[in-house]
C-alpha cells in the first residue's frame, strides 16, 4: 500500500541559496538534471537550510509548480545525501515541512498509527494563543 506519492519530480543541483536574482532565503538557483541547456531555475525552498542539505552544491528532488502567480518554476521537496564512506548510496530526506504534515494527515485518515486510530477531528497548523504550532 502506498500512502503518498510525488509525481513529476526532477533532480537538480543547487547553485546558490539564496538565489542571486531573488534574495529571499526561500528561493534557490537550481540547475535541473537532464535538460539540454544548463539554465538556472528559480526554485522555492520552503525550509531554511535544513542543516546544510539545501546549500550550494547539494542535490535535491523538486516538484514542478504550475501556478502563474509564482516566480519559481519548481519547489524543493527532498534532499539527496551521500555518505563519504559509501558515495553510491543515496539517502533521501524530506525537507518540505508541508510533506510531513500531509503524510501525518494521511496516516491519521487511514488509521496507520497504532494508538491514534479512528480520530474524529484534528486541525493542521493551529494557532495557540499568539503563536502558531507546526
Which residue stretches match the model-derived regions?
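Nuclease-adjacent, charged terminal/linker segments that flank catalytic cores
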Residues: 1-106, 112
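Active-site metal-binding core of divalent-cation-utilizing nuclease and nuclease-like domains
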Residues: 18-20, 92, 117-134
